[in-house]
């Protein structure tokens, strides 16, 4: 504002207070804004450099003069003549801009160089207050990225809108966040509460800039929000009557889970699972869990995050009817239940399943839904099959859960043949214990239908144990042992194999003569091959040395020269790489997409898994097999490996192979002749 001086002279009047007073007020406001609020009180927002329009303020200072008296008297007349035109307020230093149709158009129109200049000004003016830098970044991006319609986040990918920005803008954002690592939580809170304030307005602005800043922080530092989840849960509960605000908080905090599976499970269990069942929030809570499990196919990183206290409420939500979930939501949660069960049981289910057995057993009542009863019985069977301690837990709970135990016993009767041998042994001991308990109850006269059902199931199990299938394998083993023992006794009785009855049978059948003929042929061929090698190998070796010796010497000399040259060049390259490798790494981090790093991480985990699971056991087994074979070979040669021993071993192997081949051929020939004779 301006007015004429009493003496009729022009007088320069500046807007507001003095610059020193204004800056002092700004620093005071900024200091107040940096204080982290306790509880759920909203963060007091300070004016950022961009919002104050410091650049325009400095340009306008010293240029405003007091107009003449007649000019000041004409202003009300002009305002009356043009009532539609409003006088711009002195505090509005930022001009309104037109909105873009899509976020892609807004990002293309964004002037990255201007953003860089504004951020540099902010850092120069407030070098010791990085919270102003990050707030300026959020305010600038949100002001510039205005669209006609706000996209529905539930219909977009989990990394939207951060996935749309280019590498240059990502580099600027990341470099600024790297300079302010201690105020990242302040930035996230600033963006969240700014979005909540915009939602209070009838025609609020788009929130793309705030969302991009939240994603940029939590993609690298997910623990920024997971370290204080109770605060966000209280904030969520305070806005339950405003679904859009709740979804905004859930979306913002949920961004921490897409780079770290453990932090994502913390977010879902600590923020979204408590509101599961709230009508307007349940769809996003289930969708977030689906996207989280889809983004992290390797569930091993989440082992230990879900315990019995969290798992069984999830089980009830997934299978119990008439709860606060709709049938479609319950079906979606039921599809995710198997992965949640794997996470709950952990890497060693054989040592943790007995802790889940009591809760499984108490829920497996005859009146529970069929699908839930099927899942509970299957889980109880897994507990008994994998964790032997579950049997002792079952024996302790038997008298308190007779109806549930009868269902489990009947299931064991139906699936008895498919149970493992170790489980059958434990079931036998448990059933005998149950029989004793049933007898005690019957003696006291406290019989019931559930007790009778349990007793009948125990009787059926005992009957199953006694009436097993025909032991074919035992019969085959016994027959083989009997045949081998008979031959051995026959040879021992007649003092030699040639005089034994077994040899006579083989002689009459023609097998003995055939095997002798085969052995003679193999021995003859082996002797011929040995004599050929003894005659020709020295001659061929001398010729090879005469022809290839000079060539091999030249190759060896060239190899030495090439090795020396490679070492010389390699040292130069190593020194060059040592000097330039940090720059290359920094350039790669700013240029390569994040998906490439994720793919490399997945590939590394796959190779590590293959190395530990398959390669190392295979190498160990191969080493043991080779060592065992060599020991057996040395033992067969009486501890000394000679050429005669090698020749004998080769002869034995050849004889055995030829005998087996001839026997197989004769068997096949006889079978073919039999088939032909039938026709």
UniProtKB/Swiss-Prot annotation:
Biased composition (Basic and acidic residues): 18-30
Keywords linked to the UniProt accession: Apoptosis, Endoplasmic reticulum, Glycoprotein, Membrane, Transmembrane, Transmembrane helix
Pfam family name, one: TMEM214
Gene Ontology BP terms: apoptotic process
Principal subcellular localisation of the protein: endoplasmic reticulum
Protein origin, superkingdom: Eukaryota
Region spans: Disordered: 1-94
Family the entry assigns: Belongs to the TMEM214 family.
Matches recorded under PANTHER family: TRANSMEMBRANE PROTEIN 214
The protein's name in its UniProt record: Transmembrane protein 214-B
Organism this protein belongs to: Xenopus laevis
């Amino acid at each position: 504002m301006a007015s004429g001086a009493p003496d009729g002279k022009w007088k320069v009047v500046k807007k507001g207070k003095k610059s020193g007073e204004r800056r002092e007020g700004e620093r005071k406001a900024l200091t107040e804004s940096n204080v982290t609020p306790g509880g759920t009180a909203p963060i007091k927002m300070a004016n950022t450099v961009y919002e104050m329009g410091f650049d325009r303020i400095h340009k306008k200072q010293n240029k405003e003069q007091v107009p003449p008296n007649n000019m000041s008297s004409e202003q009300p007349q002009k305002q009356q003549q043009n009532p539609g035109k409003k006088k711009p307020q002195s505090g509005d230093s930022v001009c309104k801009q037109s909105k873009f149709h899509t976020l892609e158009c807004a990002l293309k129109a964004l002037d990255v160089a201007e953003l860089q200049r504004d951020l540099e000004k902010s850092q120069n003016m407030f070098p010791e207050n990085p919270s102003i830098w990050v707030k300026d970044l959020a305010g600038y991006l949100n002001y510039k990225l205005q669209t006609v319609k706000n996209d529905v986040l539930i219909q977009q990918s989990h990394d939207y809108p951060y996935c749309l920005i280019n590498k240059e803008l990502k580099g600027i954002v990341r470099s600024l966040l790297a300079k302010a690592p201690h105020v990242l939580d302040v930035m996230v809170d600033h963006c969240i509460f700014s979005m909540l304030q915009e939602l209070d307005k009838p025609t609020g602005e788009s929130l793309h800039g705030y969302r991009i800043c939240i994603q940029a922080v939590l993609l690298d530092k997910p623990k920024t929000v997971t370290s204080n989840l109770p605060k966000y849960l209280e904030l969520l509960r305070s806005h339950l009557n405003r679904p859009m605000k709740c979804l905004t908080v859930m979306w913002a905090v949920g961004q921490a889970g897409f780079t770290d599976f453990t932090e994502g499970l913390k977010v879902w269990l600590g923020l979204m699972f408590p509101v599961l069942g709230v009508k307007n929030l349940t769809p996003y809570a289930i969708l977030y869990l689906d996207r989280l499990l889809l983004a992290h196919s390797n569930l091993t990183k989440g082992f230990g995050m879900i315990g019995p206290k969290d798992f069984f409420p999830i089980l009830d939500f997934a299978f119990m009817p008439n709860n606060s979930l709709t049938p479609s939501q319950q079906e979606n949660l039921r599809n995710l239940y198997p992965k949640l069960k794997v996470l709950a049981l952990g890497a060693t289910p054989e040592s943790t399943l007995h802790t889940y057995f009591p809760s499984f057993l108490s829920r497996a009542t005859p009146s529970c839904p069929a699908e839930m009863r099927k899942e509970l019985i299957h889980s109880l069977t897994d507990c008994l099959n994998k964790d032997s301690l579950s049997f002792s837990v079952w024996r302790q709970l038997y008298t308190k859960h007779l109806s549930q135990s009868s269902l489990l016993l009947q299931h064991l009767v139906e699936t008895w043949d498919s149970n493992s041998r170790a489980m059958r042994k434990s079931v036998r001991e448990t059933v005998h214990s149950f029989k004793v308990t049933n007898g005690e109850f019957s003696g006291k006269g406290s019989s019931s239908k559930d007790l009778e059902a349990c007793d009948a199931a125990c009787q059926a199990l005992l009957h199953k144990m006694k009436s097993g299938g025909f032991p074919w394998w035992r019969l085959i083993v016994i027959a083989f042992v009997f045949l081998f023992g008979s031959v051995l006794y026959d040879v021992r009785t007649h003092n030699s194999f040639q005089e034994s009855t077994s040899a006579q049978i083989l002689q009459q059948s023609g097998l003995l003569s055939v095997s002798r003929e085969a052995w003679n042929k193999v021995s003859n061929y082996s002797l011929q091959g040995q004599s050929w090698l003894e005659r020709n190998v020295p001659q061929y070796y001398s010729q090879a040395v005469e022809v290839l010796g000079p060539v091999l010497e030249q190759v060896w000399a060239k190899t030495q020269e090439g090795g020396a040259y490679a070492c010389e060049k390699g040292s130069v390259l190593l020194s060059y790489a040592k000097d330039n490798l940090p720059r290359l790494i920094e350039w790669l981090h700013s240029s390569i997409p994040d998906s490439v790093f994720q793919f490399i991480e997945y590939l590394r985990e796959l190779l590590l898994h293959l190395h530990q699971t398959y390669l190392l056991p295979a190498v160990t087994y191969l080493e043991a097999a080779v060592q065992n074979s060599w020991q057996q070979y040395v033992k067969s040669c009486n501890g000394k490996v000679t050429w005669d021993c090698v020749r004998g071993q080769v002869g034995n192997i050849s004889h055995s192979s030829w005998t087996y081949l001839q026997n197989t051929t004769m068997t096949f020939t006889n079978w073919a002749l039999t088939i032909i004779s039938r026709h």
